[in-house]
């Protein structure tokens, strides 16, 4: 799985998530463009999950250890499965031009783990990064064509990184943290067959605190992780 994820719903898989900022065929649009919630005319709940199966084979590997010369090492591969759930709610306020929404999903994550037998351990090991985005949004329909939307995002992130599992000097990092972001969006409906949407999601710099183990000496530390903004 890559670091930035597109899998905030299941329905967009067949079109590679193209147009997710305006299609609004279910409640998951709250995770893409808050303004497009105005296109939903009744309360709606959407729940889904995506499994990402990563299978990669590496061959013809050349490795230069810190205290040795370049050498060829055995072939290896990756075979990881990552489960990504999501849940969304959209609720139009009857008799008003307002629509409210809430979402729990993930925008960022990766899960890579090499076998302990991999002969280039400082490049192998395990890299696991996970994030949970809990968002609350509102949309206002200005007229039949235009809608505006926005919301706040509470992002919880955790990660585990380990290297050199067979060495006397292993590295292991286990940390987590919370950041606060926001999102803004606009939707424009031309007619029943044409519409446009644009959204911007500000992703904060997340401060992760936890345990850093290096050279068999554990200590508590923190690291600032700048998350990329999203425009679609």
Question: For each of these PLM feature ranges, what is it?
Answer:
Residues 37-38, 53, 108, 144:
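Glycine-rich nucleotide phosphate-binding loop and flanking beta-alpha elements
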Residues 17, 21, 26-37:
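Periplasmic N-terminal accessory/gating domains of Gram-negative outer-membrane beta-barrel systems
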Residues 10, 25, 29-32, 42, ...:
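Generic alpha-helix structural propensity
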Residues 30-31, 44-50, 88-90, 99-103:
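Short, conserved beta-strand segments within well-ordered enzyme catalytic domains
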Residues 1-16, 20, 63-73, 81-232:
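Outer-membrane beta-barrel porins/channels
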Residues 4-19, 38-57:
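Transmembrane beta-strand segments of Gram-negative outer membrane beta-barrel proteins
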């Amino acid at each position: 799985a890559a670091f930035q994820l597109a899998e905030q719903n299941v329905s967009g898989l067949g079109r590679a998530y193209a147009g997710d900022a305006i299609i609004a065929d279910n409640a998951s649009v709250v995770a893409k463009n808050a303004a497009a919630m105005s296109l939903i005319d009744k309360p709606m709940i959407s729940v889904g999950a995506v499994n990402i199966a990563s299978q990669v084979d590496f061959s013809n590997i050349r490795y230069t250890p810190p205290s040795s010369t370049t050498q060829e090492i055995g072939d290896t591969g990756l075979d990881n499965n990552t489960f990504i759930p999501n849940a969304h709610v959209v609720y139009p306020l009857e008799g008003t031009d307002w629509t409210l929404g809430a979402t729990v999903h993930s925008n960022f994550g990766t899960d890579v783990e090499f076998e302990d037998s991999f002969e280039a351990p400082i490049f192998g090991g395990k890299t696991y990064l996970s994030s949970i985005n809990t968002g609350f949004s509102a949309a206002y329909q200005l007229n039949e064509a235009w809608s505006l939307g926005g919301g706040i995002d509470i992002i919880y992130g955790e990660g585990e990184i380990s290297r050199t599992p067979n060495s006397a000097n292993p590295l292991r990092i286990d940390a987590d943290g919370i950041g606060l972001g926001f999102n803004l969006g606009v939707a424009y409906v031309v007619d029943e067959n044409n519409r446009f949407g644009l959204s911007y999601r500000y992703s904060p710099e997340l401060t992760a605190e936890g345990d850093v183990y290096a050279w068999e000496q554990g200590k508590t530390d923190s690291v600032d992780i700048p998350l990329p903004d999203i425009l679609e």
